């Protein structure tokens, strides 16, 4: 060291450390800072501070870095104001984080898009044409040491990471990205339908419902190998995509005599199925092969760039199909192309997800003398790890099993990153590498982490990238681009969680480390560890569907910001779903649909600029019928079918998730009209408790409510003692859970129960309109009859409840509206599991609120609470009363988890508030507790039942109960009660 350059220890380092520590962001947990050295060069007028890695593990921008440098100079307590300060975090000069700009990041340069849905999402300011590779952590895999299939993580807090991350990616994140115009590829099965049908000309175990017609050009065999389902079970080395033939035809221009290939799968049952196509990519393949999908939704067309993606399964979407058979085309391929001299190729089609068909066996290290056999997983394919999907999808075994079939665990995590390069190889993103020529913009590995606290502390969000200390990707992009992607996504996640759920949410480090899924992809890549699945405080939020929606939206926004900034263009975020939806009769044959846009307080660009109206007639499928610029639509009705509607908000960034479903039915001028009000908007985690040393989820009382469905629930929690540690994945400690539902899909809130109620109302001869509870509460019309759907609505808090509660059964505005209508003579049918408990046994309400709630229930609806959790068998029956309309009814409502209807664990029991006005009309079968009451209040009549009407499993039973209710209203409408006394005399009401 020269006299002009010296390094200080002890006190100076401590002062600098103290200064840097003071600038750590709030709720950050990147690890402890450490100052290794402080060197001052007076000749160069430079201060160099070398710190440990943690100093570079947080988000750094020009302002924060300037503040850090300023604090260093202040800590030196000398005249160094004109000195340059350089701060190192490990090997990284923090200035280098700012030297990489977005204009140095190279995006794809391909002329033609990969997959183009005709009449699809219009998102010029979204992710239109971008290709994203993404996967949801681990999956069910074969462990040769134990000669069994198992999860890669422990069963804990009613889920397992291998399934848990899917509950973000499949129902939320993938659709959001697709709604923004992106094409998303996954190395795991994305269809939860356990039926799977393969149609292929090569036969074998495939259906052979494949047909060709030749027009100007004739079909012939291509010179390359293709798919054949020659083995029902795949073993080591098997690749179905080199076992068969590919068909080929020269392309013609649109309007010429076309040649057509059709695939007509015989599906075992009606339902939603994913459709995958396959083909070969040849030197002269068409960039715009035209596929048509015929489904219950109509005909949808796609242009597929066959120059990319040959020799694997290419996803086109999910579609609703009838149970179909030979001769009814489902997928069609025409040989039209805009490119002269191009060829079209055709190979197998896959419909549905199915069960795993890759068998594994112990190859090395087994017990001597045992002749190990191949073993299948026997699990749905969507639960399996990526390694097995890749084999089924024709990926070379050099990618999916670098261990040569010895170690599936390491193969799986190594294969996922290598798969990205296999997709991108040969494209502008990864030239000079053999692959599928698909220009992948970025990749995301979505994981959750381990780690636990004994209190209410959040573990929080960790993100990992790899910069190779300033290295570059194959296309010249600086690897620091991954840090920019990581920062964008992590910032959005943490900011949105703090703004909506938990202001103390921890932002952990942005690690620059050589994790395979962050290091291997030759495109900007992020490995996300969202939260700790082992920490109860994290999972109070993590099991909540609305939290999952928010996080998924944050990730989508982070990707959008990164790609838009890379491309130097403005971006627009897709809107949130609309609110306050209502359908009202305008005049004969005309109905007004109205709604309101939902403001995204975190994103100013997310307001809708137009709306898409979709209609479903009867029990058909939704189809687009209108595009409107204002928040209303006039539906013209000339029949007595049930017409259901949903609204999709849209802007230049894409489209929102659909709204709740409302419906109408017009039975003619003489029919009375029922207004159905959807007050069941709840989606939530299971009930939980925290009693210090014991805590956990109590789904025996309430499993929570999934959004549409849940694919992450494995079974109830069994270990509630906080001090029980993890010892093995088979002995997970605190939070350990059962496994009896881990292959099942669990039904949730479909937001489509107006239709279920409406079917029974229409069967009784009544017309109906419908409304969301919000719109209804603010309306001023005077309906004759109200049918209020409350399902499993109840007041809850998410996590610590910092931002208040939601989903109360009867908010004040709704109470006021119903009270006003009652005075005006509106009759009311109310059904729900918490119609009384939420107003009496509610720890989130003050005494004053409870008093007001109970007064409303007694005076307006005519009941008082007896008990919650009133039935477990799910059976109820009518009892004799002075209201003779209710007789001979027996009802079975859903009390078990299943894939078609949400479960009712805790139905309510209550009794008439006034025996002179009300009567018991229904009891639960196993204990004779009251399950329903009817009241004739003089001004209005009410019927209230303690379980949701829509969960009655038999349609005829639903029809019977609805007709009995409507007959009761009709017979008492004039104020003359058809009331039977104990001696069968009839009294008039005054």
Descriptions of predicted regions:
Residues 635-654:
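Beta-strand-rich modules
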Residues 562-605, 654-672:
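Pro/Thr/Ser/Gly-rich low-complexity, intrinsically disordered linker/stalk tracts
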Residues 793-901, 918, 957, 961:
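A glycine-rich, often tryptophan-bearing local segment used as a flexible ligand/cofactor-contacting loop or short
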Residues 259-283:
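A short beta-strand element within beta-rich, extracytoplasmic domains
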Residues 331-343:
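Short beta-strand-plus-loop segments that form exposed binding edges in beta-rich domains
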Residues 348-356, 427, 442-471, 501-567, ...:
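Active-site-adjacent mobile loop/cap segments within catalytic or ligand-binding domains
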